[in-house]
Every structure is written in structure tokens, then in C-alpha cells.
Amino acid sequence: MGSAFRRSLAPVLLFVVVCLTALNLRSGIASVAPVLGQIQDFFGISSGQAGLLTALPGLCFAAMGLAAVPLARRVGLSRTLAGGTLALVVGLGLRPWVSSFSLFVALTLCVVAGIALANVLLPAWIKQHGSGRTLVALMTTYTTMLGVSSALGPLSAVTQKSWQGALWIWCLPAIAQLVAWIVVLPQAGRDVAHGTVDGAGAQRPMFTSPTAVAMLFFFGLQSTMAYVQMGWLPRMLVEKGVGENTASVALAVIGVFNIAGGVVMPWLISRLDRLTPVPIVLALCTCAGWGGVLVAADAAPLAWASLMGIGGMCFPLALALLTARTRSALTTARLSGFVQPGGYILAGLVPLSVGVVRGATGDWTAVLIGLMVLSLCMLVVGLRATTHVYIDDELAA
């Protein structure tokens, strides 16, 4: 990404920025699912159009993910992340109060565009400004706060009286995030990511790395599970006889397990050479969770959510691998810019397909069987993605 321009930031400031940014990476999306039916009634939209709302995050993440690295090359990591935060604040602040569905979609795009830039660039920003134990601690903070965001997002539907309030409330932490970036910008300077891979290795496309390709599909399949859960799980449970509040709590339970995964996974990766059992256990838990919803959703909805939550630890695992399997901020940014957009294309298409299949079949059977199959596919690619190799070395070979 060009020549490095790097300034040292105070550790406290690093942690504050990472905490606030990660806190806003899921709440603006996860808060939609519990009130999706109310939004559908308010705008008078079809199930297919509602499915579009659940697909937007993945598709926009893919598009903005492709733009994130070139944009950061031009203006720097911190400036790009600050600009994305501004878009997030505008979208979250205005989205609940519009009367046009088209405008609602446009403002949702602002929300997910801001989140998308942070999804791709925050790991590279952490790699750029952190080192040693601080780097591991920052990645732990990042993945943990992602779980907090996922857990808290659905609960706004329980605490707020209207769907508008449930969505708008998340503008407040986004404003705090914007203030933090305003403080960081003068100190960070034009922090273009630096790298260590030279020559052909620096120019070779990421798809020439088998591990990077496996990470793309692993990330994509786990993101698929996450966005189907955030977009459709509460509705699945409600239509199978579970109360609305319980359905919202079930989604929050998944987020609680993501918090645990955020704490555990960076630590686990930094200490274990062999991670093979991890994707096996997590993928099988995901499969079992979907199976429980299929055969007995109302019998133990929180148990099925807990299994999905354990399986959801694949997400912090995939994120932690971005820095653990690269040697430089440059390669981290390139890997993140390859893995996340490609993964989010898959994660965007599947939730959209869920709405279409549900509308065509009239129930959730085909959808849930398909999700169980995808869980097993995640197991297969996860075995390759967790191999202990460095992407830099594969590119230079």
C-alpha cells in the first residue's frame, strides 16, 4: 500500500477506538430482524422485499469490501474508517423516520457501507498500530465487542416501544465512535498500511494462496449462518410457535456465545499449532442447532440458539486468522479485502434465497435442511483454513 506513514497511538486510545468501532459492527443490522415484521407491515412490502433487507448487508459488504483497500491506499486507514463512521451515523440517525421504503433501503445502504469499511479495514488498522501482546489484546477486544454487538442488537426490540426506537437507539454509540475517530485522526496521520512481502509475492493475487481461498469460503459460510440468523431466525421461531420476546432473546443468546468466542479464539490461535478439532466441533454444533429448529423449535429454542452460538465462534475464529496468518499489515489488508468481500457475496445471496424459498414452499423445511448442508460444507473448508501457514509465504513461494 505504498510507503508506510505510521505514528504511535496511546494504548488506551487504541482500545477505546477498537471497542467503539466493533460495538457498532453488528447492532445496526441485528436490530432489524426482531422488528422485520413490523417494518414489513409499516411499508406494506412483500416477503421478497423483506428478504432484500436481510440480503443487503452481505451484498453491500462485498461491494464496499472491494473498494475499501484501494480507498485506504489513497487516503489512509484512519481517514477511511472515520468516513465510514460518518456514513453509519447518518444512516442510523435518519433511517427509522422516513416514510418511503426506497429511502429506507438507501439509508440502510449507508449503514452497511460504513460497517463494511470497518469490517475490512479494522483488522489491518489493528495490525498497523498494534504489536506483540498489544496486537493479540486488540484482536481479542475486537472479536469480543463484535459478540457484544450481536447480543445487544436484538434486545433493543424488547426495550423500545416502537420499531423506530429499536433502530434509532443505535445511533448513539455510533456518534461516540465518530467522536473517537475525530480524536484519532490528527494523531494517526496518513496511516497507509506497510508490508514486508516484496517482488512477485506482493503482486500475486490472493486466490493463488490455497489457505486464503479456504479462508474466503470459511468466512463466507460462517457469515451466511450469521446473517440468516440475524435476518430470519426470530421469524422462523415465531412461525414455529415461539413467543416474540423469546425469539429475540434467542438471537441475543447467539451473540453472548460470540462474546465468549471473541475472548477465546485469538488466545487459542496464538497458543495452538493444530486447530483441526475446532472447526469440526463448531460446524457440527451449527448443524445441530438448525436441526433442532427443524424438528422441535418450540421445545427448546434457547438450547438450539446456544448450539448455534457455539457454532458461531467460527466467526471470531475467521477474523482472528486474518492477523494470525499474516506477517504484515499490508498482507492483512489484502487478505481481508479478498476474504471478506468474497465471503459476503455468499452471505448476501443465501439470506435472499431464504426469503424466496420460504415464499415458494410455504414453510421452513427446505431452508433448514439447506442450512444444515452448508454447515457441513463449513466444516470441510474450515479444516484447510485453520492450517498453520502464513499467507505471505504462500504468495512468495
Label every model-predicted segment.
Residues 273-318:
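C-terminal transmembrane helical hairpin of 12-TM major facilitator-type secondary transporters
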Residues 44, 76, 97-102, 273, ...:
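Helix-breaking motifs and short loop linkers at transmembrane-helix boundaries and internal kinks
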Residues 33, 210-262:
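Extracytoplasmic gate region of multi-pass secondary transporters
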Residues 63-101:
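Conserved MFS/SLC helix-loop-helix module at the cytosolic interface between two early adjacent transmembrane helices
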Residues 64-76, 261-274:
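Helix-to-loop junctions at the C-terminal end of transmembrane segments
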Residues 107-144:
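Cytoplasmic helix-loop-helix junction between adjacent transmembrane helices
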Residues 103, 132-133, 140-186:
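Helix-loop-helix hairpin linking two adjacent transmembrane segments in secondary transporters
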Residues 326-365, 371:
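A late C-terminal transmembrane helix in Major Facilitator Superfamily
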